[in-house]
Regions:
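Mature extracellular/passenger domains of Gram-negative fimbrial/pilin and adhesin proteins
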Residues: 2-8, 19-179
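Hydrophobic helical h-region of N-terminal Sec-dependent signal peptides
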Residues: 10-14
């Protein structure tokens, strides 16, 4: 009986492996190879830039009358220091925290008298190119002598329709990315 059970177990094990051994790549299929690198050290975000507050200009709701309209971009910087010599450049990668999936902008989270049909859009260093949440802004060189860098980005109002007056509060997260 024990011998039969062992033979049955081996036969079943062979059946489960058989499809894998003889499987062939089907037409229209391929592979994806991921390569990366983990760094032992990172730059330190300067104290005043860890939790940054950017005050956008006060504008009339009438200045954002249709979806896609934007307000003037307001500059903000993120500075880092104590960067390891092995790193040559740094950028902010803006997470999908509080993201509108349709626009990939930051939704308005104001709880008291919120403005309607308005979000905050991140903009790259040129003041024109949108940075969609889940993306990385431009990389900035790390100064080898000071082991520091300052990244410059913008935020601006972005209408999702005819806007209504009120408060705007938009919060997202970022992490540092390196090259």
């Amino acid at each position: 009986m024990k011998k039969q059970l062992t033979q049955l177990t081996m036969a079943l094990a062979g059946l489960s492996v058989a499809p894998m051994v003889f499987a062939q790549t089907a037409p229209g299929t391929g592979t994806v190879t991921f390569n990366g690198q983990l760094t032992a050290d990172t730059c330190v975000i300067n104290a005043g830039d860890i939790n940054k507050t950017v005050t956008l200009d006060t504008v009339s709701a009438q200045s954002l009358p249709v979806a896609g309209a934007t307000g003037d971009a307001t500059n903000f910087t993120i500075s880092v220091s104590q960067c390891p010599a092995t790193l040559s450049s740094v950028a902010a990668h803006f997470e999908t925290t509080n993201m509108d999936p349709a626009t990939r902008n930051i939704i308005n989270q104001a709880t008291v008298s919120p403005a309607t049909n308005v979000e905050v859009q991140l903009v790259d260093k040129d003041g024109k190119t949108p940075i969609l949440l889940g993306s990385t802004g431009s990389f900035y060189p790390i100064n080898a002598a000071t082991q520091s860098a300052t990244m410059s980005y913008y935020g601006q109002y972005y209408a999702t329709g005819k806007t209504g007056a009120g408060n705007v509060t938009a919060v997202t997260s970022y992490t540092l990315a390196y090259q």
